Amino acid sequence: MKIFLFGVMTFLIVINTLGCSKNEAYNSQEAIKRGDIVYQNEVVNLERLKQFLINLSNKKEDTIRITGYTIEGDPIFHDLQFDGKVIQYTYDNSNDHFAGDDKGTEKDVCKEVVKKENEHGEAEFLLSGCSKGNSLFLLRVEKEKLKKQWSN
């Protein structure tokens, strides 16, 4: 009887863990509802990025998720968790059905988010000062859209 109960409990724990996975795939409408900064054809919830940047400059803890989608609709997650000192970054393309050998998660620790203008006049947001030595691209926004949304 004990073995049976142990088996049932183990099964329930595994099912619960899999069902509540933080990185479970969800569509862009659900991502918007959850408060993710979503980029697909356009960037949605951009004001959340602005608040995160304000919190960074004030050394206030904050967490955001930036979710992009492949052409096929598979989510790519960028999780940024600021502890008041550094940004813990996780890149997760484990739901990308066409990721090939690069499929999975990668982690890094970075110092800041920088905004740069690219050759097309768009604002690009990147993580810099990362422990692995390279800057990490987060998202790209048309400068006019950024100015319009952030002027409010």
Give the positions of each predicted feature.
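C-terminal motif of bacterial Sec signal peptides marking the signal peptidase cleavage site
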Residues: 16-19
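Sec-dependent N-terminal signal peptides
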Residues: 8-12
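Positively charged n-region of N-terminal signal peptides that target proteins for export
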Residues: 1-5
